[in-house]
Amino acid sequence: MTTTLTRPTDGEGSVQVHQDPGLNIQEETLVIAVYGKGGIGKSTTSSNLSAAFSKLGKRVLQIGCDPKHDSTFTLTHKMVPTVIDILEEVDFHSEELRPEDFVFTGFNGVQCVESGGPPAGTGCGGYVTGQTVKLLKEHHLLEDTDVVIFDVLGDVVCGGFAAPLQHANYCLIVTANDFDSIFAMNRIVQAIQAKAKNYKVRLGGVVANRSADTDQIDKFNERTGLRTMAHFKDVDAIRRSRLKKCTIFEMDDEDEAVQAVRSEYLRLAQNMLDKVEPLEATSLKDREIFDLLGFD
């Protein structure tokens, strides 16, 4: 005989996860979670945005939340060990760790952490993200931070990888001007709607990436109540910066395209610091997106 337990929900159709109050990041810190379709450029966007905040004089911490642990390599110029790897080395006795074991200083003083994740097909990567925040709190590493950026795996919005939303003030969604990216963005909007019922996270807006135009994004924004916060065209200097393992702020100063991208990142960072008005966007049904996007 099966017994169904009545449990409070965390938004529609999911189980409420009660976060330990001790893991809350202090109110004065700006916390941003970056989501978007897999391969859309979230890590590039996150790292360059972290660099921009640092250029504005802010103390920045970027947390990579992907088992691939490639979120921060343009900041640190290398692949750094993950929190889960370091914890395994000490048999998960976190008290044996020092901050320098898992926090690495990158470009212009940006602090970088890669949470990592369990082997493919096992465990919960979102749990690892929670343990990473716990470890940072234990070592008082969040107390002297102005901005925290969570760079989150793909467009996965299950309970585990939605964990950064429990800490974030705002969610930025990175998208391209195409159907697949916007379809994924709609699913992320649905997740934000669910989490916003119980947590402080709100939609900040959209970052249009690798797109010459934004006509399809504009259609979706107008219909749902979203807005575009920044627009990065398909600039080859951004691709080359990844190959050089550096941020856009370390590329050739004489390149006008590089200067334009830098200015857009600095503008986005300043806008986020100026207290973005949170959005009350409404997601669409799958069929509605299908009918909305495209050409007549």
UniProtKB/Swiss-Prot annotation:
CC cofactor note? Binds 1 [4Fe-4S] cluster per dimer.
SUPFAM superfamilies attached to this UniProt entry: P-loop containing nucleoside triphosphate hydrolases
Q: GO molecular function terms here?
A: 4 iron, 4 sulfur cluster binding; ATP binding; metal ion binding; oxidoreductase activity, acting on iron-sulfur proteins as donors; oxidoreductase activity, acting on the CH-CH group of donors, iron-sulfur protein as acceptor
Q: Which amino acids does the record list as binding Mg(2+)?
A: S43
* Binding site residues for ATP: G39, I40, G41, K42, S43, T44, K68, N209, R210
Return the InterPro entries for the record: NifH/chlL_CS, NifH/frxC, P-loop_NTPase, Protochlorophyllide_ATP-bd
Q: In which pathway does it act?
A: Porphyrin-containing compound metabolism; chlorophyll biosynthesis (light-independent)
Which keywords, in A-to-Z order, does the entry hold?
4Fe-4S, ATP-binding, Chlorophyll biosynthesis, Iron, Iron-sulfur, Magnesium, Metal-binding, Nucleotide-binding, Oxidoreductase, Photosynthesis
Q: Which domain of life is it from?
A: Bacteria
- Catalysed transformations (reactions): chlorophyllide a + oxidized 2[4Fe-4S]-[ferredoxin] + 2 ADP + 2 phosphate = protochlorophyllide a + reduced 2[4Fe-4S]-[ferredoxin] + 2 ATP + 2 H2O
* A single BP term in Gene Ontology: light-independent chlorophyll biosynthetic process
Q: What does this protein do?
A: Component of the dark-operative protochlorophyllide reductase (DPOR) that uses Mg-ATP and reduced ferredoxin to reduce ring D of protochlorophyllide (Pchlide) to form chlorophyllide a (Chlide). This reaction is light-independent. The L component serves as a unique electron donor to the NB-component of the complex, and binds Mg-ATP.
The similarity comment for this entry is:
Belongs to the NifH/BchL/ChlL family.
Q: What is this protein called?
A: Light-independent protochlorophyllide reductase iron-sulfur ATP-binding protein
Source organism of this protein record: Parasynechococcus marenigrum (strain WH8102)
What gene is behind this protein?
chlL
